[in-house]
Amino acid sequence: MPPEFELIKEGNGLSFYERWINMEDGTKSREVKFIISIKAPYENVIEVLTKEKYGMLWNDNTLAYKIKSTGPQSWISYMRYSFPFPLSDRECYLKNRLEEGKESTKIYFNSSNSRIFSEGVEMVQMTGLEGRWIVTKKQGYTLLRYHIISVPEKG
């Protein structure tokens, strides 16, 4: 069973947690979790997370943000990030799947091998990512939970 999350920082409606998990191959992976209280309607939060036009507004250091639908509640998202020297710019493709519930919506994501927005371009890929967003309706606000872990590549 993985260890409990440790609270790292808290303030202004945001709590940041982390934990280290021993993977099957012996490597350690860091999992982070954010819990954010947002004074905005639930539907608006879902729209910001799922619509291309908002991606660069909430995703820091993003040079490009694109979405391609793959089904009624699934899509591929593409982010190209700017990193300072000595790192190079990187890109990330994620498969996303949305599950709607009565009081909350979950968006699961994990790294994708797709290159639909950067075919033929040599770029460092951010891989081995998986996580989820959980958006919950509350009285007068929306609660947003974000989990992400970097999972070592197999092979």
Specify the residue positions occupied by each region the protein language model found.
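Eukaryotic helix-grip
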Residues: M1-G155
